[in-house]
Amino acid sequence: MLKRWILPLFIACLSFSQIAKAELELVITEGVNSARPIGIVPFKWHGEGKLPQDISAIISSDLQRSGKFSPLPTNKMPQTPYKDADINYEAWTKMGVDAIVTGEVKVNAAGKYEVSYKLIDVVRGQLTKGKSKGLSNSGELVLTQDHILVNKIATLSKTQLRKYAHRISDVVYEKLTGEKGAFLTRIAYVVVNDKSQHPYQLRIADYDGYNERLVLKSKQPIMSPAWSPDGKKLAYVSFENRRSQVFIMNIYTGKRELIASYPRHNGAPRFSHDGKELAIVLSKTGSLQVYIVNLQTKKMRQITRGRSNNTEPFWAPDNKSLIFTSDRGGKPQIYRVNLEDGSTKRLTWQGSQNLGGQITPDGKYIVMVNRSETGFNLAKQDLETGAVQVLTKTLLDESPSIAPNGGMVIYSSIYRKQNVLSMVSIDGRFKARLPATNGRVRAPAWSPFL
């Protein structure tokens, strides 16, 4: 029964050790050599002392973590040009690099930082020698420089430098892949310190672990954080009143709203993609069942019924259906329910158990926890063909959460007998860990685009 499966997970939530007092620290474990080479030339710093943020290093790390790019190490670059006129295109193409990023940082009279950068198509630059021409609107032949894909400048404060570096990564990623970047997003997660007066803490950080911030602390367990579509609120489960309750909290004001406090179990909150409704799981009638709450009227409707346990709802991109985990077939598998007519279909068949499913933003795949002979690992299933690909080889994987662009998945796993957060690209090639420098972390939730 699913209750037997949920209980060990709940007990595990009570057994975390130290809190992550420092920021999460990302460690790349696999996939660097299989990605597309790119040159992120160190930005030229026109100032005294050290640049407050190493912008080029941040961009390199972002693109590497996407699993699609392999930034060339600085010591292996054929040159470090700061102007496109100085680029030796042939030297870069010999290194297998077809795009490079160059930039400069200056301090203006007002003490602000002026950051300029260019994304350059090396292949086109080599063909045209950086001097391609075309017709202007007036019909004149002019220098077009169409090998320069992006040419931007921004004036920033010191505190904005790191954020802008992520913005550059987003621009470069989208220009080269055609997909939106997710480097300006955040993650929410739960940390626990048994020695603290408030051992259970809900925290948020940039997707790469920087700028960690405490959102909520409690003497009782906190579970299942989920972001609102606007990125301003978190829904979560709290046991602060000695029973499970579902709350929604504004992460900027701290204002909280109680959504569900029924007898027995209240859990697994998940916002609809338009933010108007919240799917939750209640056991007020006996077994676990999925409900939907209208967040404006507070009216609630029951979605699943029967004697089986149904939990872990997740909305389809069009908000017209939900996937959920159910033990109606004996062991946990993932099903889909049509919210208009209530019809239900089993989706997963490969593996003795499949649970914790999420649908990718394009609606093509489910990412889930798949149990096989090797244990609990993340897997991806094609919703059209049913083909399944196991993405991870880590231990006791759980709680997958997909980046808003569908390119990466963050999840909880075990490493050296400790709970850590891990990342894997949606194709399974790139892998990384985000262990806290002091403590254990679980229940990750990736924010929407911010």
Curated annotation (Swiss-Prot):
Keywords: Cell cycle, Cell division, Periplasm, Signal. Residues 1-22 form the signal peptide. GO terms for biological process: cell division; protein import. It is found in: Periplasm. Pfam families: PD40 (PF07676), TolB_N (PF04052). Its main location: periplasm. It comes from the Bacteria. GO terms for cellular component: periplasmic space. Part of the Tol-Pal system, which plays a role in outer membrane invagination during cell division and is important for maintaining outer membrane integrity. NCBIfam families: propeller_TolB. Belongs to the TolB family. The Tol-Pal system is composed of five core proteins: the inner membrane proteins TolA, TolQ and TolR, the periplasmic protein TolB and the outer membrane protein Pal. They form a network linking the inner and outer membranes and the peptidoglycan layer. This is Tol-Pal system protein TolB. It comes from Aliivibrio salmonicida (strain LFI1238).
